[in-house]
């Protein structure tokens, strides 16, 4: 089987992290976002993944090359010279995808349990051309809502940001299609959600399966941190042995074994610490991601923050309110950062009391 992952654009919503790396290889819970998806696909027998890329494909290729051998999977690249939306990439990759079998399509920003085996079985059971996963949301008026027959999952229509309640299930960004869908799509900028799916629904060829468990589009910092908490809580119930325990840990917390946590720290809940980090004594971390090679000074207090690679945070620093530090950022002692977005290679010597982008 094959799968296409829509890697797409420039990752502007997750800047400044994506100024250093393409978004799919930014680490989410100490693993590149896209590896969460590729590993799940491998488990159900997918043997080739096609990445639809148009931004820094060489970095993606260099990063993922070792994983082809490690995971026993072929990773191919379909290069867009111009952005083709969410459907055009399928037509561009037609020759790679069309082998007579159903294939998966994923948005690269999605984190969930990826129940691909269940999705494949349901798709084969109804005989339609396509199946999309849907997830339940609390405020459907913010989304495009999927309206479908409860008894068999056949999709009737899509309603964009409904002001009157029509349902609470939305497109979760994970699909499986028969190759015949490729006859509907031209290699030009096309929206699969707004152009292709309504046509398939009108032909009674599109079905949906509800996703059980957590789901999040982690393409922007606030959702990245929320998704991290959901993911860690899922690990807590399914693979608790991967999580940190002991004095000073309020789980769930994920810490790379190469990192050093000095005495007197209080870490968690919902914290990930990447490789080769040092968290000095007396530091408090909550709802925070610390990426590889970072040092945090003594007695700092950090909440709802993403700290980029190889950064250094001084002593008695306070950061909060979805602050995001790019790669190689240096923060002096005794500063306050409130919602700051700091570009790579910056030295911060004064506080940022209000949300601000530091160029």
From Swiss-Prot:
Keywords: GTP-binding, Magnesium, Metal-binding, Nucleotide-binding, Nucleotidyltransferase, Transferase. Coiled coil: none annotated. GO terms for biological process: GDP-mannose biosynthetic process; protein glycosylation. GDP-alpha-D-mannose binds at residues 109, 217. Residues 2-221 are annotated as: Substrate-binding domain. The keyword Transcription regulation does not apply. InterPro entries: GMPPB_C (IPR056729), GMPPB_N (IPR045233), Mannose-1P_guanyltransferase (IPR050486), NTP_transferase_dom (IPR005835), Nucleotide-diphossugar_trans (IPR029044). Enzyme activity is reduced by incorporation into the GMPPA-GMPPB mannose-1-phosphate guanylyltransferase complex. Allosterically inhibited, when part of the GMPPA-GMPPB complex, by GDP-alpha-D-mannose binding to GMPPA. Mg(2+) binds at residues 109, 217. GO terms for molecular function: GTP binding; mannose-1-phosphate guanylyltransferase (GTP) activity; metal ion binding. Pfam families: GMPPB_C (PF25087), NTP_transferase (PF00483). Its cofactor is Mg(2+). Pathway: Nucleotide-sugar biosynthesis; GDP-alpha-D-mannose biosynthesis; GDP-alpha-D-mannose from alpha-D-mannose 1-phosphate (GTP route): step 1/1. It catalyses: alpha-D-mannose 1-phosphate + GTP + H(+) = GDP-alpha-D-mannose + diphosphate. The active site is at residue 161. Coordinates binding with substrate and required for enzymatic activity. Its EC number is 2.7.7.13. GO terms for cellular component: cytoplasm. Disulfide bonds: none annotated. Belongs to the transferase hexapeptide repeat family. The N-terminal substrate-binding domain adopts a Rossman-like fold and has a binding pocket for GTP or GDP-alpha-D-mannose. Substrate binding is coordinated by an Mg(2+) ion. The C-terminal domain consists of a series of tandem hexapeptide repeats that adopt a beta-helix conformation. The beta-helix forms several protein interaction surfaces involved in assembly of the GMPPA-GMPPB mannose-1-phosphate guanylyltransferase complex. Component of the GMPPA-GMPPB mannose-1-phosphate guanylyltransferase complex composed of 4 GMPPA subunits and 8 gmppB subunits; the complex is organized into three layers, a central layer made up of 2 gmppA dimers sandwiched between two layers each made up of 2 gmppB dimers. gmppB catalytic activity is reduced when part of the complex and binding of GDP-alpha-D-Mannose by gmppA induces allosteric feedback inhibition of gmppB. Catalytic subunit of the GMPPA-GMPPB mannose-1-phosphate guanylyltransferase complex. Catalyzes the formation of GDP-mannose, an essential precursor of glycan moieties of glycoproteins and glycolipids. Can catalyze the reverse reaction in vitro. Together with GMPPA regulates GDP-alpha-D-mannose levels. This is Mannose-1-phosphate guanylyltransferase catalytic subunit beta. It comes from Dictyostelium discoideum (Social amoeba). The gene is gmppB.
């Amino acid at each position: 089987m094959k799968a296409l992952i829509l890697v797409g654009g420039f990752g502007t919503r997750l800047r400044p992290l994506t100024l250093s790396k393409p978004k799919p290889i930014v680490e989410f819970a100490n693993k590149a976002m896209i590896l969460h998806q590729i590993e799940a696909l491998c488990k159900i027998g997918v043997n080739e993944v096609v990445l639809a890329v148009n931004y820094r494909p060489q970095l993606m290729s260099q990063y993922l090359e070792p994983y082809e051998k490690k995971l026993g999977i072929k990773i191919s690249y379909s290069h867009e010279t111009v952005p083709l939306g969410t459907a055009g990439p399928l037509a561009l990759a037609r020759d790679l995808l069309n082998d007579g079998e159903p294939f998966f399509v994923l948005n690269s920003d999605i984190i969930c349990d990826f129940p691909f085996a269940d999705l494949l079985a349901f798709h084969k059971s109804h005989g339609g051309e396509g199946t999309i996963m849907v997830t339940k949301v609390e405020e459907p008026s913010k989304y495009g809502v999927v309206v479908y027959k409860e008894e068999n999952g056949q999709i009737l229509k899509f309603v964009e940001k409904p002001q009157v309640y029509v349902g609470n299930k939305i497109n979760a960004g994970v699909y499986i299609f028969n190759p015949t869908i490729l006859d509907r799509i031209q290699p030009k900028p096309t929206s699969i959600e707004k152009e292709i799916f309504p046509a398939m629904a009108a032909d009674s060829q599109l079905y949906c399966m509800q996703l059980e468990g957590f789901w999040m589009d982690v393409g922007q910092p606030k959702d990245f941190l929320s998704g991290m908490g959901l993911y860690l809580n899922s690990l807590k119930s399914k693979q608790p042995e991967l999580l940190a325990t002991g004095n000073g840990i309020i789980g769930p917390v994920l810490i790379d074994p190469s990192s050093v946590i000095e005495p007197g720290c209080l870490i968690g809940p919902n914290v990930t610490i990447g490789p080769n980090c040092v968290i000095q004594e007396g530091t408090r971390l909550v709802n925070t991601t610390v990426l590889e090679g970072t040092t945090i000074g003594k007695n700092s207090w950090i909440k709802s923050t993403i700290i980029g690679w190889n950064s250094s945070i001084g002593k008695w620093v306070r950061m909060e309110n979805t602050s995001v530090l790019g790669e190689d950022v240096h923060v002096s002692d005794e500063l306050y950062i409130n919602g700051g977005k700091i570009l790579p290679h910056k030295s911060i010597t004064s506080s940022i009391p209000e949300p601000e982008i530091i160029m």
